[in-house]
A protein has these predicted regions:
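Residue-level recognition of tetratricopeptide repeat
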Residues: 28, 64-66, 100, 136, ...
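Intrinsically disordered, low-complexity polyampholyte segments enriched for Lys and acidic residues
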Residues: 58, 77, 126-129, 141, ...
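Low-complexity/repetitive intrinsically disordered segments
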Residues: 2, 190-196
Length: 196
């Protein structure tokens, strides 16, 4: 990161990639993931989604949970691989089971929408809850939506408002809008146009 971010040295993308590549070739998980990110964004190398997927897969198979999420994203969007919700679901699940909150949120979405798996609201709520408990802001917002709409859980205005507020206070824009809507409508709180 020193050469990439210019920490203690002048920033040098080519030098950063040299060292990241050296770490990746030594089978260092974080190095493999970072090299995948370089290829994903064209950071110090020419952008190449197929190479990004290769290194995400190598890192994911070595146990790097963020690489599992990134590989799931590639399958979800069809970047560097043929689009496959089943593969996206599989990698999100592996990342979630390793404790990575972004994967928990994405896995919840798969269960909510039936992407790559049979729709299951209770499983969606379970994974949103786990992501929220880890401090993941989007998971908090998604969980609040479930409580607001009574999807996968019993409708509960207080819980919806609680999770919207926590997510909004953390900076999640969607949660800010949802919290404002609650104040506008008087949902779970006294109607307050100024607060909205």
């Amino acid at each position: 990161h020193a050469f990439h971010d210019g920490i203690g040295v002048e920033a040098d993308a080519a030098e950063a990639v040299y060292w990241v590549r050296a770490a990746a070739y030594q089978r260092y998980g974080e190095g493999m993931h970072r090299l995948g990110v370089c290829y994903e964004y064209g950071d110090g190398v020419e952008q190449n989604w197929e190479r990004a997927v290769h290194w995400f897969r190598e890192a994911a198979e070595s146990g790097v949970s963020v690489a599992m999420a990134d590989l799931g994203y590639c399958y979800e969007k069809g970047c560097g691989v043929e689009q496959s919700w089943e593969q996206a679901f599989s990698w999100y699940r592996r990342g979630a089971e390793c404790g990575y909150p972004v994967s928990m949120s994405n896995l919840g979405l798969c269960y909510k929408r039936g992407y790559g798996v049979e729709q299951n609201w209770q499983e969606a709520v379970k994974w949103y809850e786990q992501g929220a408990q880890c401090g993941h802001l989007q998971s908090m917002n998604n969980l609040a939506c479930c409580y607001e709409d009574g999807e996968g859980v019993e409708q509960n205005e207080e819980r919806a408002l609680y999770w919207y507020r926590r997510s909004a206070e953390g900076g999640n824009g969607s949660a800010m809008c949802n919290l404002g809507r609650c104040y506008k409508r008087g949902y779970g709180v006294e109607q307050n146009w100024q607060e909205a």
